C-alpha cells in the first residue's frame, strides 16, 4: 500500500479514494496513514468469522476515525448513534429517514435511475444517477458531501454522478431476450436485501435470484441471505461463489 501511494505521489495524483476494510483497521494495515475524510456507510452481519461479534466489528470500523480529520456518518444506520458516541472528530451525518445534516427530498427511484433534490451550500440542486436503487441515494449523498468538503465544484460533481457507471453494481446485461438480467455484487445480507427490494418495486414479472457465498468465510450470514432471497425473490438458485477449500 505504501509503495502504491508513493507511486501516486510521484505521478502527481492529489487525491485517493480508498475502501478501508475492517480487517485492515483491526490488523493495522493502514497504520500511519492519515485520512482527510473518513466515511461510514453501514454495518451489517458480515466478517463475523473474523470479528466474532458485531461490537468487535463496530470497534474495528471506529478505528478509521481516529486517523481522520473529519467523519461522514450514515445517520440512518442502526449503529450510527453508538458510533457517534465513540468518535471525537468533527462530523456530519447523511440519510433519508432521521434528523441528519445531508438529506434528499423529492426522491424518485425507477427501474433505470434515481433522481432527487438536495441543498448544497444553501443552493437547491437536482441530482440524477443512472444506478437504480434507494441505496444509490445514500451513496450519492455521501459522495456529494465528501467532494464538496474538498472544494470540488458542484457542476463537476453533478456531471460525474450523471455519467457514473459501476461494473457489477445494478448492471443490466443485454442478452437480447424479453427478460432483464442484472448483475450486482451483493454479497452480504444488507446489500442483497437492498438490491432485491429495489428490483421488486419495478419488476413486471418473476424475480429469479442466483447467488452464492464465498467458501472458508463467514458462515453466519448464509442462512440470513437465504431467507432474504426466499422472501423477496420468486425463485432462488444457490450456486458456488469461490468455494476455496470447502
Region locations from a protein language model:
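Conserved phosphate/oxyanion-binding catalytic-loop motifs
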Residues: 184
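Conserved helix/coil segment N-terminal to the catalytic DExD/H
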Residues: 23-31
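Acidic, Mg2+-coordinating active-site environments of NTP-dependent enzymes
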Residues: 11-13, 17, 35-181, 204
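Short, ordered loop/turn segments at secondary-structure junctions
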Residues: 22, 43, 96, 214, ...
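Active-site beta-alpha connecting loops in nucleotide-dependent enzymes
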Residues: 166, 190, 197-246
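Glycine/threonine-rich flexible loop motifs
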Residues: 27, 49-55, 218-221
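Conserved nucleotide-sensing/catalytic segment adjacent to the nucleotide-binding pocket
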Residues: 1-21
Amino acid at each position: 500500500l505504501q509503495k502504491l501511494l508513493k507511486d501516486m505521489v510521484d505521478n502527481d495524483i492529489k487525491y485517493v479514494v480508498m475502501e478501508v476494510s475492517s480487517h485492515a483497521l483491526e490488523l493495522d494495515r493502514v497504520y500511519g496513514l492519515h485520512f482527510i475524510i473518513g466515511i461510514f456507510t453501514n454495518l451489517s452481519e458480515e466478517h463475523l468469522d473474523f470479528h466474532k461479534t458485531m461490537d468487535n466489528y463496530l470497534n474495528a470500523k471506529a478505528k478509521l476515525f481516529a486517523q481522520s480529520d473529519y467523519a461522514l456518518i450514515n445517520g440512518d444506520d442502526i449503529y450510527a448513534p453508538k458510533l457517534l458516541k465513540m468518535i471525537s472528530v468533527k462530523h456530519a451525518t447523511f440519510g433519508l429517514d432521521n434528523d441528519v445534516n445531508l438529506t434528499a427530498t423529492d426522491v424518485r427511484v425507477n427501474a433505470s435511475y434515481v433522481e432527487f433534490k438536495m441543498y448544497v451550500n444553501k443552493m437547491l440542486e437536482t441530482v440524477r444517477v443512472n444506478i437504480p436503487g434507494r441505496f444509490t441515494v445514500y451513496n450519492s449523498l455521501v459522495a456529494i458531501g465528501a467532494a464538496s468538503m474538498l472544494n470540488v465544484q458542484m457542476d463537476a460533481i453533478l456531471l460525474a454522478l450523471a455519467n457514473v457507471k459501476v461494473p457489477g453494481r445494478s448492471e443490466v446485461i443485454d442478452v437480447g431476450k424479453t427478460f432483464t438480467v442484472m448483475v450486482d455484487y451483493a454479497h452480504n445480507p444488507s446489500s442483497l436485501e437492498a438490491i432485491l427490494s429495489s428490483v421488486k418495486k419495478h419488476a413486471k414479472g418473476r424475480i429469479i435470484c442466483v447467488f452464492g457465498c464465498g467458501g472458508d468465510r463467514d458462515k453466519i450470514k448464509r442462512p440470513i441471505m437465504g431467507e432474504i432471497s426466499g422472501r423477496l425473490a420468486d425463485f432462488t438458485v444457490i450456486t458456488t461463489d469461490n468455494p476455496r477449500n470447502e
